[in-house]
């Protein structure tokens, strides 16, 4: 049996998921395909070395428009943005370091 879709979204990153949500809300039959075994794209936290986890680009989730968060009722699903006082730490060869983030002087 052949299945028919109005739209096929390639990639289950945060943009693809938001796109699929709005298309489905508009009444379209949507299919999402993702090559990886995890959804979220750049917004996921993954173990890159045993015992070490990082969210390389998870900041992208904080760029979601407030209207998208409301439309998708993400807060009811546990979505929340946690502000970090330090967003980046870069150690230097001479023992010094560079810290970047909101509120740092």
Per-region residue spans from a language model:
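N-terminal glycine-rich phosphate/pyrophosphate-binding loop and immediately adjacent elements
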Residues: 3-105
């Amino acid at each position: 049996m052949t299945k028919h879709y109005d739209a096929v979204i390639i990639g289950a990153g945060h943009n693809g998921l938001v796109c699929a949500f709005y298309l489905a809300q508009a009444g379209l039959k949507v299919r999402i395909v993702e090559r990886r075994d995890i959804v979220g794209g750049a917004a996921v936290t993954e173990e890159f070395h045993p015992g070490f986890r990082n969210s390389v680009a998870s900041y992208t989730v904080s760029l979601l428009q407030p209207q998208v968060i409301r439309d998708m009722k993400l807060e009811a699903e546990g979505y929340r943005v946690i502000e970090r006082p330090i967003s980046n730490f870069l150690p230097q060869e001479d023992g010094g370091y560079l810290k970047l983030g909101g509120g740092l002087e």
